Amino acid sequence: MTQGAVKTLGKRSQAVSAKKQAILSAALETFSQFGIHGTRLEQVAEQAGVSKTNLLYYYPSKEALYIAVMQQILDIWLAPLKAFREELAPLVAIEEYIRLKLEVSRDYPQASRLFCLEMLQGAPLLQAELTGDLKQLVDDKSAIIAGWVASGKLAPVDPHHLIFMIWASTQHYADFAAQVEAVTGKTLQDEAFFQSTLENVQRMIIEGIRVR
């Protein structure tokens, strides 16, 4: 293959990747507003700036597109937990996990709300991912927390409930952003409010698991 052909192939691959990402971004916006049942592929195609035929070339059905969006969300959602490291001091590791989770709520609110909506519906299209990659990762990190508890580095706490508490307290600011803004007049986009939220959530959780 000539150098020119390689460059052409590379540009074509980049164009395809950009088009697929545009479709996924449009689908996220539409699904988060209307849900899978209220969304039409024509809406997504128009939002992405492609034809419906072109959309179906990459994602052959609405369900396939929805699953692709949810898998991308799950990758974003799991990234902070993957960064949870045993070699850090326990309280430092947990503080950092809280920070990363709150940043996800700030930076990807639509993704968080769509994920929440899927959970409320029983996650019919996401069971394989939840019982596979998600469960394995949570089990692995729970074992780290259990080890810290056993060695006296953390107060006695059930690892699963600690993780659930962190999820609940950080994702609330994305999933219930309208309520948070109605009560406080602020969102996580306000840097001072983000910092105050982070410090308060960290303090409430850390003080509950600190060894005394």
Show where each model-derived region lies.
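C-terminal peripheral helix-coil segments that are non-catalytic and often amphipathic
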Residues: 1-7, 103, 107, 135, ...
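Generic hydrophobic, amphipathic alpha-helix propensity
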Residues: 19-28, 44, 69-73, 77, ...
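Helix-turn-helix
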Residues: 22, 30-64, 68
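Amphipathic alpha-helical linker/stalk segments
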Residues: 69-96, 144-147
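Hydrophobic alpha-helical connector segments
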Residues: 82-111, 159-166
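All-alpha amphipathic helical-bundle segments outside canonical DNA-binding/catalytic cores
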Residues: 92, 128-133, 149-165
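Short alpha-helical scaffolding segments that buttress acidic/His motifs in well-ordered protein cores
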Residues: 98-101, 115-118, 166, 170, ...
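Amphipathic alpha-helical segments used for helix-helix packing
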Residues: 106-128, 176-184
